[in-house]
């Protein structure tokens, strides 16, 4: 599946989605979001678990078929799919029990990665439905493109704000999406915030009608 445009398993303590954001929550600006990454994990290794069964890694991790199989990975999301990036694809894993999804993205502030947020998030969520699944989301360095897609997933499916998502990922891996990707995550945050507040408002109105 493709959308155009020796490893150590680390044990981490995970937070949970914080549900509905506070009423006075406002999406921070790009600089404020960047500062959140500075407070995160200083370690940079080939691959890190950032959420249960969800890992962010680099090109070396994705190319190491032996370690992937030994570690039990069942899904791979390549955020740098393509001939001039990390050129793997379904054929690279054809004799392995791995489901592949590729996103052909460039690590440039001008690249519109947001058009892949929902399809990538859906692939991750589908993978995590099985207790036996383990998914690697990678790009070349495992810092920008892959991290951005994982952040979007946590926001879409785990009801996190962009701040919650960054704190969750950054405490487990040294990542830093480019400024353009951060702006796209800000827009996603504002869209999701509006949707959730509207949904909450509708629920409250329905409850009031039932009480009358």
Curated annotation (Swiss-Prot):
Its main location: cytoplasm. Residues 1-15 have a biased composition (Polar residues). Residues 46-194 form the Tyrosine-protein phosphatase domain. Transmembrane segments: none annotated. Signal peptide: none annotated. Its EC number is 3.1.3.16, 3.1.3.48. One of its GO terms (cellular component) is nucleus. One of its GO terms (biological process) is negative regulation of MAPK cascade. Keywords: Cytoplasm, Hydrolase, Nucleus, Protein phosphatase. The keyword DNA damage does not apply. The keyword Nucleus applies. Residues 1-24 are annotated as: Disordered. It catalyses: O-phospho-L-tyrosyl-[protein] + H2O = L-tyrosyl-[protein] + phosphate; O-phospho-L-seryl-[protein] + H2O = L-seryl-[protein] + phosphate; O-phospho-L-threonyl-[protein] + H2O = L-threonyl-[protein] + phosphate. Gene3D superfamilies: Protein tyrosine phosphatase superfamily. InterPro entries: Atypical_DUSP_subfamA, Dual-sp_phosphatase_cat-dom, Prot-tyrosine_phosphatase-like, Tyr_Pase_AS, Tyr_Pase_dom, TYR_PHOSPHATASE_DUAL_dom. One of its GO terms (molecular function) is protein tyrosine/serine/threonine phosphatase activity. It is found in: Cytoplasm; Nucleus. The active site is at residue 139. It is an enzyme of class 3 (hydrolase). Substrate binds at residues 138-145. CDD domains: DUPD1 (cd14575). Pfam families: DSPc. Dual specificity phosphatase able to dephosphorylate phosphotyrosine, phosphoserine and phosphothreonine residues, with a preference for phosphotyrosine as a substrate. Dual specificity phosphatase able to dephosphorylate phosphotyrosine, phosphoserine and phosphothreonine residues within the same substrate, with a preference for phosphotyrosine as a substrate. Involved in the modulation of AMPK and MAPK1/2 signaling pathways. Belongs to the protein-tyrosine phosphatase family. Non-receptor class dual specificity subfamily. Homodimer. This is Dual specificity phosphatase 29. The gene is DUSP29.
């Amino acid at each position: 599946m493709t959308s155009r445009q020796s490893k150590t398993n680390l044990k981490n303590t995970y937070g949970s989605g914080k549900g509905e954001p506070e009423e006075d929550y406002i999406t921070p600006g790009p600089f404020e979001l960047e500062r959140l990454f500075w407070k995160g994990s200083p370690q940079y290794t080939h691959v890190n678990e950032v959420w249960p069964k969800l890992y962010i890694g680099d090109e070396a991790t994705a190319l190491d078929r032996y370690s992937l199989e030994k570690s039990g990975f069942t899904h791979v999301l390549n955020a740098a799919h393509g001939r001039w990036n990390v050129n793997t694809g379904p054929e690279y894993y054809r004799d392995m029990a791995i489901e592949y999804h590729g996103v052909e993205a460039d690590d440039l502030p001008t690249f519109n990665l947001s058009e892949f947020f929902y399809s990538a998030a859906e692939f991750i969520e589908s993978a995590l439905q099985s207790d036996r699944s383990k998914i690697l989301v990678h790009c070349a360095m495992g810092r920008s493109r892959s991290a951005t897609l994982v952040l979007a997933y946590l926001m879409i499916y785990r009801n996190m704000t962009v701040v919650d998502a960054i704190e969750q990922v950054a405490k487990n891996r040294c990542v830093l999406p480019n400024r353009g990707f951060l702006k796209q995550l800000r827009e996603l945050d504002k869209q999701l915030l509006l949707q959730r507040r509207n949904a909450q408002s509708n629920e409250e109105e329905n409850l009031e009608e039932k009480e009358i």
